[in-house]
Amino acid sequence: MTSSFDKQGLIDAFECLDEELARRGVRAELFVVGGAAMAIAYDARRTTTDVGAIFVPTDVVREAAKEVAEQLKLEPDWLNDGAKSFAPGNDSAQTSVFEGRFPSVAVASPRYLLAMKLLASRTDRDIDDIKILYKLCGLSTAEEGIRVLESYYPTRIIPARAQFIIQELFPGERPRDRDT
């Protein structure tokens, strides 16, 4: 079993999740981040292997997602909450992308996602997303990216990886050190 979702594949999975939640009579909220948020809302060419999300009620959504995995022949953890420990809190600018009868699905705003992507700074997976998010946020300098990261993660040290990626995107421009 392998899962690879494009925008339509994500919608199909959410429709199936809607049916499973309806069987249980339970309403749920999902806040999608990472590659799935990019694929469904910000980059039509993007695909993802899973759906990273924060969801409630957690146990019921997990059970329903397992049923969806069986029905659609997806990986058992196609819907997971592995990124929740990296989420910087509430996103007042989130966007609704799917309103079923039982689940409500929203994605993180471009700035929120940019902060998460910069914090993770996985060069193999995040650089293209970072470029798209920079553009969507109307940013054009290294300093602006650092400010977004600091605004969502004010107590975290900016990883060297993030500085490296930003320097790669803006050669010749050096982001300021946090202490200056």
Task: Name every feature range the model reports, one short phrase each.
Residues 1-180:
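Compositionally biased terminal segments of proteins
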